[in-house]
From Swiss-Prot:
Biased amino acid composition, Low complexity: 247-264, 434-464, 493-554
Annotated stretches, region: Disordered: 1-24, 62-87, 197-464, 493-560
PANTHER family: PROTEIN CBG23787
Domain of life: Eukaryota
A biological process term (GO) from this entry: regulation of transcription by RNA polymerase II
Composition skew (Basic and acidic residues), residue ranges: 294-430
Compositional bias annotation for Polar residues: 1-11, 274-288
Gene Ontology, cellular component aspect: NuA4 histone acetyltransferase complex; nucleus
Record protein name field: Putative uncharacterized protein DDB_G0271982
A GO molecular-function descriptor: histone binding
Length: 629
């Protein structure tokens, strides 16, 4: 059968793999090739016809490597095809050798051939081109970018392994081209030596034919399926040779070449027997030419049937492949649809996210607006607090002014009292205690005696104000005004004092003086006639006045007590004047009334401050509640 028919059985699928996996695959394939070549084909290296077969394999490998060097997927499949082609060539070596002619020279040294005498990797590595390539590779690998190598190089039967080359990719630089180049050179040299030895070596064939009857080695083809990450299997064919173990060959091969790598899944295929007649290799004389066996009609029909079956199988495989491709296409369409659906979902999600973002922006704007409103409210609150503070300060200043006025009034009152005391001490002669007469008329005037009196006494008696009693209809309960007191204090220091009494009917000082003079004349005439009666009643009046004064001293405890106070004027009649004791009592009453008034004012001020604080706190609470709402 042809090589294309044998290759038709292989069903390879291209898959993507990483560079490290690609390197491992190529290294394993090359090791299998070395193992098969040295174990099965080492004895035929002396035959010159091997060069054409090897060159054919070289051409396939070089073309595939040059065309598919940059594509890792195609490179993987091409390596598998190259391996199968190489194995097919090995299977048909016997049939091809049958057409060459005599093989006496091949069988002559069969028992003496060892792997150590054949071409080895030491010769390849020690050659000029190989050594230069290795050194260049080492220079590249020993740059600072690569990690240091800690392993020491080891040598076994002049063969370097990949660990001796400091990097697992180094073997790829010469494992195919250099090895096959050296193999060609060795084959050419062996061809010349075989042609020279064929003429002299004619008697050794009979001895080899009688002694060596080894059957041809069966080749067991195993298919290993390696699963990659994307769960697409890659077919990797390697021919593993099962041969009889001889002491020499087994020891040398085990030390020279590593054992083949094991795969995860192995599915054995039926053994294929080579179409070669063992007698054509080992039992024929050198003088008889080797004639190929002619196939019968039955065998040809069987082969045709087999080819038809294979074609049917191929068609079935193609249909299966088409179905698989359709399924794969459907899966791809479904995956694309799912991807589009996911993209739409992502777009909707992005739209929702943008909507949420806009909502957050609106919330932020609202929050900023609320914050600005709160800030304005706080500003208004600060303004109100400032206004309240101003009002409070104004009230404080007003109270301070009132206190100052009160203190000034007190000082003035003290000054007036002191001046009155001084004038009394200076002007009043030492006489007995006078009798005081009280008048209940609303407009009482001081009486003037008929006899001449000193001007000072007349002036002082005219200074005492006439205050109406509560019994009169037009009378009102009042205290002496500050204006009256100031008038009194202003008129005291003058040498000649004139009476300036303030009455409800008086409009000017002149009218007041005229009224006072007329009243004095009238009262003087009446007093002249009633002088004796008044003298008799003076003692009683004095006693009554003393009792009234004693009662009035204990009377002023509350502001309501001022209503019952009777402001009785102290008048002078007929050389009688007000006693100093009575004047002091009257001053004490006035001072007590002032103190009571000050207490009432202070209490009112305290109540006002409490009310203001309460109102301010209520206002603040109402503002805080409104801002929270």
């Amino acid at each position: 059968m042809s090589d294309d028919q044998q290759n038709g059985k292989q069903n390879t699928t291209t898959t993507t793999s990483t560079p490290t996996e690609q390197d491992d695959i190529e290294e394993k394939l090359f090791r299998h090739q070395l193992t098969e070549f040295y174990s099965a084909n080492g004895t035929f290296l002396k035959n010159s016809s091997l060069e054409s077969i090897i060159m054919e394999s070289i051409g396939i490998q070089s073309n595939n490597n040059n065309n598919n060097n940059n594509d890792s997927v195609n490179n993987n499949s091409n390596n598998n095809i190259n391996n199968s082609n190489y194995n097919n060539n090995n299977n048909n070596i016997g049939g091809n050798i049958g057409t060459i002619g005599s093989i006496n020279s091949i069988n002559s040294d069969m028992n003496d051939i060892k792997l150590g005498d054949m071409l080895n990797m030491g010769n390849v590595l020690n050659s000029g081109s190989g050594l230069q390539t290795r050194l260049k590779r080492k220079e590249i690998l020993q740059q600072p970018t690569t990690p240091p190598i800690s392993t020491e190089p080891t040598r076994t039967y002049d063969v370097f392994y990949d660990k001796d080359l400091d990097y697992h990719k180094t073997l790829r630089l010469f494992n195919k081209r250099l090895f096959l180049h050296c193999l060609r050179q060795k084959a050419l040299s062996l061809k010349d030596s075989i042609q020279n030895s064929e003429e002299s070596d004619t008697s050794s064939h009979s001895s080899i034919q009688s002694n060596d009857h080894r059957p041809l080695k069966k080749q067991k083809i195993t298919t290993t399926i390696k699963k990659v990450k994307d769960s697409s299997p890659t077919l990797e064919e390697s021919s593993l040779i099962s041969k009889k173990k001889s002491p020499s060959s087994s020891s040398s091969s085990s030390s020279l070449i590593n054992s083949p790598t094991t795969s995860k899944e192995t599915s054995p295929v039926k053994d294929t027997k080579p179409t070669i007649n063992p007698k054509s290799l080992f039992g024929l004389s050198s003088t008889i030419p080797l004639i190929p066996r002619v196939k019968t009609e039955k065998e040809k029909e069987k082969e045709k049937e087999i080819e038809k079956e294979k074609e049917k199988e191929k068609e079935k495989e193609k249909e299966k492949e088409k179905e698989k491709e359709k399924e794969i296409e459907k899966e791809r369409e479904k995956e694309k649809e799912r991807e589009r659906e996911r993209e739409r979902e992502r777009e909707r999600e992005r739209e929702r996210e943008r909507e949420r973002e806009r909502e957050r922006e609106r919330e932020k704007e609202k929050e900023k607006e609320r914050e600005r409103e709160r800030e304005r409210e706080r500003e208004r609150e600060r303004e109100r607090e400032k206004e309240f503070e101003k009002e409070r300060r104004e009230r404080e200043k007003e109270r301070e002014r009132e206190k100052l006025n009160i203190t000034k009034d007190k000082e003035k009152q003290v000054i007036r009292e002191t001046t009155i005391d001084e004038t009394l001490n200076k002007e009043t002669p030492h006489k007995p205690t006078p009798h005081i007469t009280t008048k209940k008329s609303p407009n009482l005037t001081p009486p003037i005696s008929s006899t001449a009196s000193p001007p000072s006494v007349t002036t002082y008696s005219s200074l005492i104000p006439s205050i109406p009693t509560p019994q009169s209809a037009a009378a009102t309960t009042t205290t002496p005004s500050s204006a009256t007191l100031t008038a009194v204090s202003a008129t005291i220091p003058t040498p000649t004092l004139t009476p300036t009494l303030s009455s409800p009917t008086s409009t000017s000082p002149t009218t007041a003086t005229t009224l006072a003079s007329n009243n004095s004349t009238i009262t003087s005439t009446t007093n002249v006639n009633n002088n004796n009666n008044n003298n008799n009643n003076n003692n009683n009046n004095n006693n009554n006045n003393n009792n009234n004064n004693n009662n009035n001293n204990n009377k002023f405890s509350t502001p309501d007590d001022f209503k019952s106070l009777n402001w009785i004027p102290f008048l002078k009649e007929d050389n009688q004047q007000v006693s100093e004791k009575e004047l002091l009592e009257r001053r004490m009453d006035i001072n007590q009334s002032k103190q009571l008034l000050l207490q009432v004012i202070n209490s009112l001020n305290q109540e006002r401050t409490i009310i203001e604080k309460k109102l301010l706190s209520d206002f603040k609470n109402s503002n805080t509640n409104s801002s929270k709402q």
